[in-house]
Design a protein with these regions (language model features):
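Glycan-processing catalytic domains of CAZymes
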Residues: 51-527
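Bacterial Sec-dependent N-terminal signal peptides
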Residues: 26-60
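Single conserved hydrophobic/aromatic residue that forms the stacking wall/gate
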Residues: 1-14
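Bacterial N-terminal signal peptides
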Residues: 17-26
């Protein structure tokens, strides 16, 4: 009886277990999703964030096709070409006069070692010139030589360099005070211009004429128009590579917006000249004062309304900056608008606004320069540092990143004010500038009347700002009297570890950056 009871208990437990399993199975079945075949997707791995490329602020500009005419300044990097250096024996009528034979090399009618006895601060690298002229300057191993722009081979070499280094062309400087009523000056600049036109043809460089209005006055209106008409008939309307803008040959007038009492002409005078040159068939570019937009500084503020009216009537403007800043800090902080760098942006914006409003079609060509130095002419100035090209590149990068469509570089060959980009000697290679006589230099900033003995020992008096004296004189108010040796002014060379063509190369790189052929870069490129 007891065994039967135990078996019964086992049987009950088995039944209970089976019922429990059945209940669990039913519950699971009732809760199961009807989509028995569903397989959840695999988790995708996280993708790294792709950095967003900053928008390129550069303007879209046309790319000139080799061998085609230059129909617009847009997309071009142009340089100013002085072409004003001459020498004894070069064939120019300047060489017939002792006081002008060393044309633009001279200071105080001579070209000799010593401050105020020559006008240049850089010395050209003469290794590639076909015709060379001996000077009184000496290297440790021989006589230093220079060139004359009156020689065609010299100008052709310069245009060859423009092609080799990617400089699009040149504005040929034509100085009113040197070509109007001045047969010797006209002889020189006519010959240089003719050579440059041939250089433009051979090396396919853009070319245009820029009148420097120094020496202009209303009485010379007809003579300047006649000169411009002759250039139009001979070159501008016929040469394949003469630069055009808005369908017409471009001619530039430099020196607009300054004080008329100092310049000898007003904005209204230049408006009249500009309008007449349009009738000849030209489009017009103006070289204007730095502060043309807002007034002040070098700009004649009472004439700002007439200046703006003149600007709106032309095709291109180019403000002048040489001497307004001499290092990167003053470029970024000086001037108005919180720095010259910002002024460029504001200038571009002003031109854009008047174009969009329909008031004008004027384009803006910012001006950049590699540095400046003219101590042999002005020993009371400071010599700016090129900072191995950083000073130059800072300006170029700023103008391009702010959306400029064209550039003007000052200057190709200006060794007298130290702005030249062509091949010049390094610091350790320049000739000596030590004078062979003793004399004093007097700085007279208030233009007081000073008595002194000239270099020949003759007693004289002068109110000049700076002059040479045989003997020491009492220093003028706020000025000084120093010996030539004490001043110790040497020629300025480029850095010894740079090639003599470095600034030609750097300028060419800026042209590529303007056209988006290389990246926009704040740091100057390495060669």
């Amino acid at each position: 009886l007891m065994r039967s009871s135990a078996a019964s208990d086992v049987y009950k437990r088995q039944i209970y277990y089976l019922v429990l399993c059945a209940l669990v199975a039913c519950t699971t079945a009732s809760c199961k999703d009807s989509n028995d075949d569903y397989i959840p997707p695999a988790l995708e791995p996280e993708k790294p964030e792709v950095p967003v490329e900053p928008e390129d602020p550069r303007a879209d500009v046309p790319i000139h096709v080799d061998g085609e005419p230059y129909t617009t300044y847009k997309g071009l990097l142009m340089t100013g070409y002085q072409g004003w250096f001459g020498t004894p024996g070069d064939g120019c009528s300047h060489a017939n006069h002792k006081n002008t034979e060393w044309y633009h090399y001279r200071e105080n009618d001579m070209f000799k070692p010593g401050v105020l006895r020559n006008s240049i601060d850089l010395w050209p690298d003469m290794s590639e010139y076909e015709i060379k002229y001996d000077t009184e300057f000496k290297y440790p191993d021989g006589t230093a030589q220079v060139y004359s722009a009156y020689d065609k081979s010299t100008v052709m070499l310069h245009f060859k360099w423009m092609q080799e280094y990617g400089i699009d062309g040149a504005f040929m400087q034509r100085f009113v005070g040197e070509v109007i009523d001045n047969p010797d000056g006209k002889d020189h600049f006519d010959k240089v211009l003719a050579s440059a036109m041939d250089g433009s043809d051979q090396y396919q460089r853009a070319i245009a004429v820029m009148y420097d209005l120094g020496g202009y006055n209303p009485a010379r209106f007809e003579k300047v128009v006649a000169d411009a008409q002759a250039i139009y008939d001979t070159y501008a309307s016929k040469r394949k590579y003469y630069l055009h803008e808005n369908g017409k040959p471009l001619i530039a007038l430099w020196g607009v917006g300054f004080n008329p009492a100092e310049r000898g002409y007003s904005n209204e005078d230049i408006q009249k000249l500009s309008d007449k040159l349009k009738e000849v068939g030209y489009s017009i570019m103006l070289g204007v004062s730095t502060y043309w937009r807002a007034g002040g500084g070098d700009t004649y503020t009472p004439g700002r309304a007439s200046l703006h009216a003149l600007i709106k009537s032309v095709d291109v403007i180019m403000p002048w900056y040489v001497g307004r800043f001499n290092d990167i800090n003053s470029y970024n902080t000086g001037g108005s608008d919180g720095g010259f760098a910002n002024m460029v942006g504001k200038d571009i914006e002003w031109c854009k606004n008047v174009n969009e409003s329909g008031e004008s079609k004027v384009q803006y060509a910012p001006h950049c320069y590699p540095g400046a130095s003219d101590l042999n002419m002005h020993p009371y100035y400071e010599r700016g540092s090129r900072e191995r090209g950083k000073f130059f590149w800072t300006q170029l990068h700023n103008c391009i990143r702010r959306g400029c469509t064209m550039l003007y570089i000052a200057m190709f060959d200006e060794i007298d004010e130290g702005t030249a980009i062509y091949k010049v000697l390094r610091k350790s290679d320049v000739p000596s500038n030590a004078a062979d006589v003793e004399y004093y230099v007097v700085y007279n900033p208030k233009n007081e009347k000073i008595s002194y003995s000239d270099m020949n020992g003759i007693g004289r008096s002068t109110e000049n700002t700076v002059f040479m004296a045989k003997n020491k004189v009492t220093a003028p108010t706020d000025g000084w009297c120093k010996s030539e040796k004490e001043l110790g002014i040497t020629f300025e060379g480029i850095d010894d570890d740079l090639e003599t063509d470095y600034y030609l190369w750097l300028t060419g790189q800026a042209g590529k950056m303007l056209r988006k052929q290389i990246a926009l870069q704040e740091t100057q490129p390495k060669r």
